């Protein structure tokens, strides 16, 4: 089977990896019943990742003739006698309009139909979303016969949702277990204090016999055995108190002393830290040259971007700066959108790798949303009008998750900045997100 490059502009590239079979046609019938059969239409359509009915219908629309594709037999017929070269030329136009990305030219696109019945091509190679000219005749046929939706993305998000629920249940179970252990430790520490107090009293009295020393601990053992009958699951406290040797009692005294001294050290060190924080706040966060103000951080991020830093390299450099996490994220957003006056959605798509690296840690999605809010709410910022598009782009790129977006939106409506226009501009995307969530739950 002879192969050719997909797209007329790539016909001379010997190393082009996107290929399709050369078209083979056959004239059938006579007189008024003459038809042109595109023999290998199914193979061509598979390489283009488009239904064969689309290409067949396109031939009919452009030639002004009836066309039919039989799904059962896989045959493609166009009424009339047509040369192979003519049909191949029409196929190239179809590829340019409905297959190739308008941005990078690669044929790795997927047809999307929006709620407004508009057709878009989403490129898997560069992420660019191309708007198809809806004046073409074939667009009506595509809207009425949409391609089969891949359930991969929905299944992926459903799996993520299930995984989050599982993690939440696990965290709740861990919290309950920690509470139980704390209660056991409190009981153990109180009984241990009683035991150590009695042992010190016995030492002062000079009772040197081992039996006198061990007599109070026997009573503790009996109390612990009764507690064990009530709760068989908590074994740690019982084992800790059953050891009544001299070394064990000394170890318990050391642990109690170390805990008390640790509290004393923490109390003494807290005050200087508070003073340092207060002084740094008064000086604008630039005390002794160990921390930097916000403007300096933004300038450094911009300089690193100009140097060609990658996402991981830039984020590792940013993480080392002695500034709060929210300021780092705000500086990153401001630097990435520098010089952008329009097309914030496209710019977000281009810089998605940086945003994805920035939200790698838990809780960082909320920081990114606050940074976007801060950037959009600046005076004379055109990004405020496109905030919904920015959120949609980050959501489609799996940078932001629906839970974080909805949580940020709901808190914003009740916060100090509730009168900002950002919430009104973001509302269409939030409504779409919640409707899509309810539809997926119903399915």
UniProtKB/Swiss-Prot annotation:
Bias kind Basic and acidic residues: ranges: 147-178, 207-227
Record domain W2: where: 284-443
Family to which the UniProt record says this protein belongs: Belongs to the eIF-2-beta/eIF-5 family.
GO molecular function: eukaryotic initiation factor eIF2 binding; GDP-dissociation inhibitor activity; GTP binding; translation initiation factor activity
InterPro entries tied to this protein: ARM-type_fold (IPR016024), IF2/IF5 (IPR045196), Transl_init_fac_IF2/IF5_dom (IPR002735), Transl_init_fac_IF2/IF5_N (IPR016189), Transl_init_fac_IF2/IF5_Zn-bd (IPR016190), W2_domain (IPR003307)
Gene Ontology process terms (BP): formation of cytoplasmic translation initiation complex
Protein's name in the database: Eukaryotic translation initiation factor 5
Domain of life: Eukaryota
Pfam families: eIF-5_eIF-2B (PF01873), W2 (PF02020)
Compositionally biased region (Low complexity): 280-291
Residue stretches of biased makeup (Basic residues): 179-188
Binding, GTP: 29-36
């Amino acid at each position: 089977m002879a192969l050719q490059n997909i797209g007329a502009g790539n016909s001379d590239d010997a190393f082009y990896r996107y290929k399709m079979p050369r078209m083979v046609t056959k004239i059938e019938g006579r007189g008024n019943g003459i038809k042109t059969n595109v023999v290998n239409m199914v193979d061509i359509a598979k390489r283009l990742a488009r239904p064969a009915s689309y290409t067949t219908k396109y031939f009919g629309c452009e030639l002004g003739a009836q066309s039919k594709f039989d799904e059962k037999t896989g045959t493609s017929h166009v009424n009339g006698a047509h040369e192979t070269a003519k049909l191949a030329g029409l196929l190239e136009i179809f590829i340019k309009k409905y297959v190739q990305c308008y941005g990078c030219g690669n044929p790795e696109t997927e047809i999307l139909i929006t709620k407004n019945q508009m057709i878009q091509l989403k490129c898997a190679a560069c992420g660019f979303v191309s708007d198809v000219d809806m004046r073409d005749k074939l667009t009506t046929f595509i809207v009425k016969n949409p391609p089969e939706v891949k359930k991969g993305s929905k299944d992926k998000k459903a799996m993520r949702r299930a995984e989050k629920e599982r993690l939440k249940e696990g965290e709740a179970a861990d919290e309950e277990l920690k509470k139980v252990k704390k209660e056991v430790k409190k009981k153990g520490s109180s009984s241990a204090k009683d035991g150590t107090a009695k042992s010190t009293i016995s030492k002062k009295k000079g009772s040197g016999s081992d039996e006198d020393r061990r007599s109070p601990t026997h009573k503790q053992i009996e109390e612990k055995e009764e507690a064990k009958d009530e709760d068989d699951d908590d074994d740690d406290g019982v084992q800790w108190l059953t050891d009544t040797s001299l070394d064990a009692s000394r170890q318990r005294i050391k642990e109690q002393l170390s805990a008390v001294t640790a509290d004393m050290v923490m109390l003494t060190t807290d005050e200087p830290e508070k003073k340092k924080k207060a002084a740094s706040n008064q000086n604008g966060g630039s005390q002794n040259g160990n921390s930097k103000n916000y403007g300096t951080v933004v300038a450094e991020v911009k300089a690193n971007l100009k140097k060609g830093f990658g996402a991981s390299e830039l984020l590792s450099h940013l993480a080392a700066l002695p500034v709060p996490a929210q300021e780092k994220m705000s500086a990153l957003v401001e630097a990435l959108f520098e010089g952008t006056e329009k097309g914030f959605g496209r710019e977000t798509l281009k810089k998605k790798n940086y945003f994805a690296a920035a939200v790698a840690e838990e809780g960082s999605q909320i920081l990114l949303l606050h940074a976007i809010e801060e950037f959009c709410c600046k005076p004379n910022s055109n990004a405020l009008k496109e905030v919904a598009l920015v959120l949609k782009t980050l959501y489609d790129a799996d940078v932001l998750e629906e839970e974080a977006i909805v949580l940020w939106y709901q808190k914003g409506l009740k916060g100090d900045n509730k009168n900002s226009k950002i919430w009104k501009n973001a509302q269409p995307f939030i409504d779409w997100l919640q409707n899509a969530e309810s539809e997926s739950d119903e399915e």
